[in-house]
Amino acid sequence: MTDVLVVLKVFPDSDEVNLDNLYTDISNKLPKEYRIIRKETEPIAFGLNALILYVQMPEQTEGGTDNLEEVVNNIQGVSHAEVVGITRLGF
């Protein structure tokens, strides 16, 4: 079994949300099989930035990326999160 790398775009509730704190909250609430490989910020508009997370997770996860989106969407300070890319790691 191999892993996949999921690119997740996380939109904060407002421009007042601290993205570093949001990143910490997300990383603490992810299942133990998930690992954040990299994080970036992306300007959206009017001072609002999105958090871009590169998450490694098992390929054979039941429900695919739905579980990842659900966990992140239920965190305080998150407006919504969406998968913008996915690729298989290894062969």
Curated annotation (Swiss-Prot):
Record InterPro entries: eEF-1beta-like_sf (IPR036219), EF1B_bsu/dsu_GNE (IPR014038), Transl_elong_EF1B/ribsomal_bS6 (IPR014717), Transl_elong_EF1B_B_arc (IPR004542)
Entry's Gene Ontology molecular function annotations: translation elongation factor activity
CDD domains given in the database record: EF1B (cd00292)
Pfam families: EF1_GNE (PF00736)
SUPFAM superfamilies found in the cross-reference section: eEF-1beta-like (SSF54984)
Entry keyword annotation includes Amino-acid biosynthesis: no
Gene3D superfamilies with a match to the protein in the record: 3.30.70.60
UniProt entry keywords in alphabetical sequence: Elongation factor, Protein biosynthesis
Entry similarity comment: Belongs to the EF-1-beta/EF-1-delta family.
Function: Promotes the exchange of GDP for GTP in EF-1-alpha/GDP, thus allowing the regeneration of EF-1-alpha/GTP that could then be used to form the ternary complex EF-1-alpha/GTP/AAtRNA.
Stated name of the protein: Elongation factor 1-beta
Organism: Saccharolobus islandicus (strain L.S.2.15 / Lassen #1) (Sulfolobus islandicus)
Gene name of the record: ef1b
